[in-house]
Amino acid sequence: MSAPQKPHLNIVIIGHVDHGKSTMTGHILYRLGYFDEKTVKMIEEESKKMGKESFKFAWLLDRMKEERERGVTISLSYMKFETKKYFFTIIDAPGHRDFVKNMITGASQADAAILVVSARKGEFEAGMSAEGQTREHAILARTMGINQLIVAINKMDATEPPYSEKRYNEIKEILGKFLKGLGYDVSKIPFIPISAWTGENLIERSPNMPWYNGPTLVEALDTLEVPPKPINKPLRIPIQDVYNISGIGVVPVGRVETGVLKVGDKLVFMPAGLVAEVKTIETHHTKIEKAEPGDNIGFNVKGVEKKDIKRGDVAGSLDVPPTVADEFTARIMVMWHPTAIAVGYTPVIHVHTASVACRITEIIAKIDPRTGKEIEKNPHFLKQGDIAIVKFKPIKPLVVEKYSDFQGLGRFAMRDMGKTIGIGQVLEIKPAQVNIKK
């Protein structure tokens, strides 16, 4: 018998571009022995030659992911490491503006987030500006239901003077206030002063910051908690990709949100209403008999063809099939808009793995963010900062669920003009009639 496995957690690394997310992740993996010396030497020489030595750890990460894009981490990449207590999968969320929707699909799979902020003068402030991704990513993480947060205050070696306790306290106060406003319990959030480049306070404590007596980053990871698995709810698996594998057949890939999937089960793919039987299930190239919430799986199905299912579909139980919305009512927060939003506005809604344009058919009420009470019925328009109850009509078939029933399928982001316009939670659904083709 193999030793019992450590519990598994998915973690997303978020924060403003160039604040050090990839360097921090690469350095942690390097220190935990995940790279062979040959690769390290090669990358060191390469980065020195190009005069970009400070990219060394980030490049190690890129090499590992085989994506040496022009200094920008694009697709979501999955990496694993273990601590004393847990087995982690890191979802390295890209930091550039136009990748927020990757961040949305990535964040919806995470149990916890590390928010990386730069302590360097001007850089922290840029991340907290109206256009800043520190703000945007924190708001998204909160909406996506990530309740556990670790803040890494990076580049402490580059403050004025270096390792400044005053600067650390200033950032902790500004960011703490902001996170509290989002509904986070700030007393539970560690704010860890680090240098991703020198490795200080990643694994061992830094002698340069004797004023700090909290946990190192890796110690803080071990204080995270495994969220309870919603195994008693009906099965829901948002589909990320579908493959046709020779000798096996059709293999949809996705993460189990709720319920349990077993070999031999019959399930239904919505919105198409197609029924299939599960032949095999795999996770990380290992065959398993059943999959539970949090498992990233590929499962071979009989009874459907690759062309019948696509990213954004949801596989679910036949008894309680996933809901296809004719219309849905949601509470939204407008994060950014240059003018105003009125009835008829049609942003793209990103929910679980789907992205579908949805038209606002009614603005029911404006809400006071502090009390949650209604302050205006049927306002003519909404502007940046407003919270409101609105009705949406999807332009094409879309699976959504009430946030109170299935969190991962009931929270969404609204995108337009390459930006995140707002975020929301589904309150009520008027279901569309779908014939299930048994």
Swiss-Prot record:
The residues that hold Mg(2+) are: 22
Any one GO molecular function term: GTP binding
Q: What subcellular compartments does it reside in?
A: Cytoplasm
Q: Where is this region: G2?
A: 71-75
Q: Where is this region: G3?
A: 92-95
Q: Which GO terms describe its cellular component?
A: cytoplasm
Q: Which SUPFAM superfamilies match?
A: EF-Tu/eEF-1alpha/eIF2-gamma C-terminal domain, P-loop containing nucleoside triphosphate hydrolases, Translation proteins
Task: Locate the region G5.
Answer: 195-197
- EC nos: 3.6.5.3
Q: Has the keyword Membrane been applied to this entry?
A: no
Q: Where is this region: G1?
A: 15-22
Q: Which UniProt keywords apply?
A: Cytoplasm, Elongation factor, GTP-binding, Hydrolase, Magnesium, Metal-binding, Nucleotide-binding, Protein biosynthesis
Catalyses: GTP + H2O = GDP + phosphate + H(+)
Q: Where is this region: G4?
A: 154-157
Q: What does this protein do?
A: GTP hydrolase that promotes the GTP-dependent binding of aminoacyl-tRNA to the A-site of ribosomes during protein biosynthesis.
The family annotation for this protein states: Belongs to the TRAFAC class translation factor GTPase superfamily. Classic translation factor GTPase family. EF-Tu/EF-1A subfamily.
Protein name (record): Elongation factor 1-alpha
What organism is listed for this UniProt entry?
Desulfurococcus mucosus
